[in-house]
């Protein structure tokens, strides 16, 4: 039986997914992106940033993740992909911390495995204890995990992620901000995961102009 917290968080994720497929911001006509106003400054000078906004509880993010991984392998040299975990409620903040903790511990390989754990294996990774136990089962030192999870660095990155989501006017996941000027998503691309990445490619070209 699912715990009340587990059910509540999955319900929140489902709501976020519904929001994606009925976004508050609508593209005009056949346009498959919206302008970000005001534009977002880049954290990587000389590069075109592609920000992927995601939530581990989002089933659409889980579905598109392998495609994003493949896309990143062939991205142009002047493009940098940054994945940005966001929270639609306070209960999802630990999942933001989980992402940045795994990055700090140099275990980016566990990123797709978190999606599998939550959506396929139905693991309740919604608090530090459960996350720490799962990470330890994947070969992560538990003491280091606990220390980094609550570190100032991780807290700062979580805060920055929330600021980026607000600046890009993200109201559903997954979504992509390109060059700080444009935002697209599967819904804007016709409810098409692959189509969204094609739009990202087009926006990269547009960002160079």
Curated annotation (Swiss-Prot):
Residues 28-166 form the Thioredoxin domain. It is found in: Periplasm. Residues 1-27 form the signal peptide. Disulfide bonds join 58-61. Belongs to the thioredoxin family. DsbA subfamily. The keyword RNA-binding does not apply. This is Thiol:disulfide interchange protein DsbA. Involved in disulfide-bond formation. Acts by transferring its disulfide bond to other proteins. It holds the Pfam family Thioredoxin. The keyword Transport does not apply. It comes from Bordetella parapertussis (strain 12822 / ATCC BAA-587 / NCTC 13253). One of its GO terms (cellular component) is periplasmic space. PANTHER family: THIOL:DISULFIDE INTERCHANGE PROTEIN DSBA, THIOL:DISULFIDE INTERCHANGE PROTEIN DSBL. It comes from the Bacteria. The gene is dsbA. CDD domains: DsbA_DsbA. One of its GO terms (molecular function) is disulfide oxidoreductase activity. Keywords: Disulfide bond, Periplasm, Redox-active center, Signal. Its main location: periplasm.
């Amino acid at each position: 039986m699912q715990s009340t917290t587990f059910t509540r968080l999955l319900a929140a994720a489902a709501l976020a997914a519904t929001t994606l497929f009925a976004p508050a911001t609508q593209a005009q006509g056949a346009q498959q992106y919206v302008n970000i106003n005001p534009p977002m400054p880049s954290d990587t000078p000389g590069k075109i940033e592609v920000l992927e906004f995601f939530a581990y509880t989002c089933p659409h993010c889980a579905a598109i993740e392998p495609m994003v991984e493949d896309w990143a392998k062939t991205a142009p040299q002047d493009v940098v992909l940054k994945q940005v975990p966001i929270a639609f409620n306070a209960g999802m903040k630990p999942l933001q911390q989980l992402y940045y903790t795994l990055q700090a511990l140099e275990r980016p390989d566990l990123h797709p495995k978190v999606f599998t754990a939550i959506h396929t294996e139905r693991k309740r990774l919604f608090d530090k204890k459960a996350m720490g136990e799962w990470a330890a089962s994947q070969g992560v030192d538990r003491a280091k995990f606990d220390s980094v999870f609550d570190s100032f660095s991780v807290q700062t990155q979580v805060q920055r992620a929330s600021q980026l989501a607000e600046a890009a006017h993200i109201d559903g996941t997954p979504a992509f901000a390109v060059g700080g000027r444009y935002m697209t998503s599967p819904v804007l691309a016709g409810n098409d995961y692959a189509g969204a990445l094609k739009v990202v490619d087009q926006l990269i070209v547009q960002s160079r102009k």
